[in-house]
Amino acid sequence: MSLNEFEFQVAGIKLHGQYYSPQLVKAVVLLVHGLGEHSKRYERTVVPFLTKNSIAVISFDQFGHGNTKGKRGHHPGYSFLLDAIDQMISKAGKLFPEQPIFLYGHSMGGNIAINYCLQRNNSIKGLIATSPLLRLAFKPPPWKMTLAGILDKIMPSITLPSDLDVNAISRDKSEIVAYELDPLVHDRVSTGYSLEIMKQGEWAIEHAPEMKIPMLLMHGTNDRLTSHLASEEFASKASDTVEIVLFKGGFHELHHDLEKEKMLEKIRRWIESQIQNSK
């Protein structure tokens, strides 16, 4: 497997990306990470598993995250998040011509990936969403939502602590330690970022019947960060192109949780079935 890094521009901001290429490539996964983390966190489990199975991976650090320039936890607008995926799909097509491209989004990245497929390009072969942030698994205090609404009108770029419960990401304690020690992980989010993500999550649920792309949706039933019930609602409203898999007792980061091997194997089998179905 070879690793190559690159930069690209969206909204005048340089975003950092990389792609991982196995010797034999039969498909490409475009990976979209979640809030407060970065794309290289997937190098421990997801990337080696996929490349070992002849699936190339291309990923990038979103606005305000990882090695991408800009204010931590803030983006210039939701449409620019979709523009970044447009550019990455174009790059993936040039790097791996005629190979099927699958979009894979986790948490906030799942929100963005789902909305991309509903609102924009439908040329990708399939969509994978893990623990997508369609709704939070908890209700923020009313005062906090009121404050966020006020700040969004006067200072939408101001960032506040995300208050993410680190212990909720995985049942594997070593993963919690790794998360806390990662220098590129942060806990900042702007009011404009968080409110727009939640708005787009509700929009996605409402428009779920319009999903035309084959989709694999996975969520843990003990996810305390994003709502597995919202994922179930999305799947129930969508057509039969959406397959939902629930992991009983699973925490937020299924790819770092106790059943990660089972979860990754499901992704592999699903990708291969989509490739076979298109022949």
Q: Model segments located where?
A:
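Catalytic nucleophile-loop/oxyanion-hole region of alpha/beta-hydrolase
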Residues: H38-S39, G66-F96
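Short beta-strand/loop motif that positions the catalytic acidic residue
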Residues: M211, L217-H219, D223
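Short beta-strand element of the alpha/beta-hydrolase
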Residues: K26-G34
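Conserved alpha/beta-hydrolase
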Residues: F49-G70
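The serine-hydrolase catalytic nucleophile loop
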Residues: L35-V47
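Catalytic active-site module of serine/aspartate enzymes centered on a nucleophile-bearing elbow/loop
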Residues: E243, K248-K279
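N-terminal cap/lid segment of alpha/beta-hydrolase-fold proteins
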Residues: M1-P22
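Short alpha-helix in the alpha/beta-hydrolase fold that links the catalytic acid
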Residues: I213, S227-S236
